[in-house]
Curated annotation (Swiss-Prot):
Gene Ontology CC terms: chloroplast; ribonucleoprotein complex; ribosome
Protein name: Small ribosomal subunit protein uS11c
Annotated localization: Plastid, Chloroplast
Gene Ontology molecular-function annotations: rRNA binding; structural constituent of ribosome
Length: 143
């Protein structure tokens, strides 16, 4: 005789065989490339670094959250530095262009870490979007 299929509303819990920190084991190994583009996106809450090949296809990405930082520590310069080192070490770049976007605190630290890592930088571009008097900015915070 076949087993009865449990209903959606049944009280019996089904355990899935995933560990709590399964995020690190599920990540694919990054392709090794020698030349690429490093995109640094530094917001006021986080720093995200994406490494792409010269055609723009994503090879690897890293953020302060994936490096183990939580809450307000993700916005620190040290988190930006660790994120950059993690991304470059994994991919193994030798020559790269850097495109920096945003005005967060991890921006300069990530740029310094990239420069010290031994990667030959062909150019550093600031691609922060600047409005030509577009939308009204949000109101100032009152603390």
């Amino acid at each position: 005789m076949t087993k009865a299929i449990p209903k959606i509303g049944s009280r019996k819990k089904v355990r899935i065989g995933l560990r709590r920190n399964a995020r690190f084991s599920l990540r694919k190994s990054a392709r090794r490339i020698t030349k690429g583009i490093i995109h640094v996106q530094a917001s006021f809450n986080n720093t995200i670094i994406t490494v792409t090949d010269p055609q723009g296809r994503v090879v690897f990405w890293s953020s302060a959250g994936t490096c183990g930082f939580k809450s307000s520590r993700k916005a620190s310069p040290y988190a930006g530095q660790r994120t950059a080192v993690d991304a470059i070490r994994t991919v193994g770049l030798q020559r790269a262009e850097v495109m920096v976007k945003g005005a967060g605190s991890g921006r300069d630290a990530a740029l310094r870490a990239i420069a010290k890592s031994g990667v030959r930088l062909s150019c550093i571009r600031d691609v922060t979007p600047m409005p030509h008097n577009g939308c009204r900015p949000p109101k100032k915070r009152r603390l």
